[in-house]
Curated annotation (Swiss-Prot):
SMART domains: MoCF_biosynth. InterPro entries: CinA, CinA-like_C, CinA_C, CinA_KH, Competence-induced_CinA, MoaB/Mog-like_dom_sf, MoaB/Mog_dom. Belongs to the CinA family. PANTHER family: NICOTINAMIDE-NUCLEOTIDE AMIDOHYDROLASE PNCC, NMN AMIDOHYDROLASE-LIKE PROTEIN YFAY. This is Putative competence-damage inducible protein. It comes from the Bacteria. SUPFAM superfamilies: CinA-like, Molybdenum cofactor biosynthesis proteins. The lineage of its organism: Bacteria, Bacillati, Bacillota, Clostridia, Natranaerobiales.
Amino acid sequence: MIGEIISVGDELLEGHVLNTNSQYLSQQLFQIGINVKYQQTIGDDFDSLVSAFNNSLNRSDVIILTGGLGPTRDDITKEAVSRSLNLNLLLDENEYQRIKSFFDHLQKRMSENNKKQAYIPEGAEVLINQIGTAPGIFIEQEDKIVAMLPGPPREMKTVFLNELKPRLIKNITAEGYYKSSIIKLIGIGESQVDEIIKEIKIPNCEIVPLALRHQVHLILKSYSQNQITAEEQLKRLENMLQHKLSSFIWGRDDDKLEEIVVNTLKDKGLSLAVAESMTGGLIAGKLTDVSGASNVFHGGVVAYTEDAKLNSLTVSQKVLEKYSHVSEETSYELAKQIREKFNTDIGLGITGYAGPEGERVGLFHTVIVGSTGKRHLSRILPGGRTDIKKGAVIQSLNELRKFLSD
């Protein structure tokens, strides 16, 4: 079946808000056998939305609209779809009471315009929004499926997973089974990856390299008329890539580097402290984004200046004078001293030049110290100041992951 996603809102067209809804929905629809061939972004203009929706009716089987279900005058999605399908909007009393209860629970007064959100196209099903006021809507008309979802990503995902996805699985006629996964790589470029994977050919399978900043993700796709065959093909493809790229693979699908590091520390019963110069606390910030990190991450110090390195972490003056403040030796001193300061099993130290001035912009040194020895990573990263710092964080976390897996 052919799918289409229509995203509604001036804020999307004008670039104020990143449209993550379309990405999420495309991934989800692919998994259940709906091939998304079209995406449109339409502003808060009634005639434009009617025209866009009419076009989608002529070419797509499943049409999902996001946004424009709010209480204000520029929220026009229901009105535009109802005009195209020649449906009246009727007050749904149950939905009206749910919206009133939502405000009562928050101890807030419901505005009169929120009543607008309880109007539903005649014959449509309500997709209950458990975390917001805008309900989703599900319409079957002849051979078309039309769904409307709230715009806020958290609400959209909740309504899709709880309400819309089960209906789609029940109602659609899949033209086969699609399976996909993602393999995540660090330390190898897209062109190098392409050289390695170009000889891997499995019928009805596809590998799509996606170059990200300092990483490459491989999107794997498998198709078959039989679900088990689709899964087996995908597994075979994953195994082949694991064999060829094992030294660069750090994760799969929804894995996050910081979560892998924290969970591995937990599994091994180890503790960590970090001393950062160039990255200014970004590594510590990433680690503390993970729930339960306090069990293994004891703390960090940003020793940005030479004085801070000397006074906060008692780095040797001789080391700084002989090797400079950006060097393997200074990073080792930071790692060693932070480990002692926080009495942890592992210490990590990082120094570098984030730029934009200087001859060695992008150079960084990360040293990891533990009871089993030390590990050193040095790279020169491209990009501006922010990109370099983010890249150093990713590379350092990956080096820590490798240190823990040794």
